[in-house]
């Protein structure tokens, strides 16, 4: 009887420890897909302007892909320190612009956000803050295109 009780206790202990071994769940990807009644070139130009105004450096290729570097949090030489060690969040954007026809464009925009708890924490995928979210970037793009 004693071995049975100790076996059950060991099983419960191992189950409890295994349940605590995993990290926090990964956040869902911050992705939005929209169809805009605007030509593709106009969407690319407006999206580049919106992202540049938001503090991103924008790169475009001929295939319709728009990517950014990490968002500039402050306009000073200390911005690199924020992205490297002292900040608590950093964001970048990837977008795919596909022309449907002459006057309609499909846009897929994804925002990647990494965060940490403090100076000595490590960067992990995190939920995107609302000002940098994909939904807000789409809203700003629609404002720039005068669709709202």
Predicted feature locations:
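Ser/Thr-rich, low-complexity intrinsically disordered terminal regions
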Residues: 21-148
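Bacterial N-terminal signal peptides that target proteins for export
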Residues: 1-9
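C-terminal motif of bacterial Sec signal peptides marking the signal peptidase cleavage site
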Residues: 16-19
């Amino acid at each position: 009887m004693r071995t049975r009780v100790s076996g059950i206790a060991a099983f419960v202990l191992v189950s409890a420890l295994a349940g605590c071994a995993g990290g926090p769940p990964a956040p869902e990807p911050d992705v939005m897909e929209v169809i805009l009644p605007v030509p593709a070139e106009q969407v690319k130009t407006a999206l580049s302007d919106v992202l540049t105004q938001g503090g991103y450096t924008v790169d475009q290729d001929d295939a319709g892909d728009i990517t950014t570097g990490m968002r500039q949090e402050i306009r000073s030489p200390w911005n690199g320190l924020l992205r490297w060690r002292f900040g608590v969040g950093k964001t970048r954007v990837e977008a795919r612009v596909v022309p449907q026809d002459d006057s309609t464009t499909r846009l897929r925009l994804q925002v990647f956000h990494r965060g940490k708890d403090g100076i000595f924490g490590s960067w992990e995928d995190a939920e995107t803050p609302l000002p940098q979210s994909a939904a807000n970037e789409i809203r700003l793009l629609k404002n720039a295109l005068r669709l709202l």
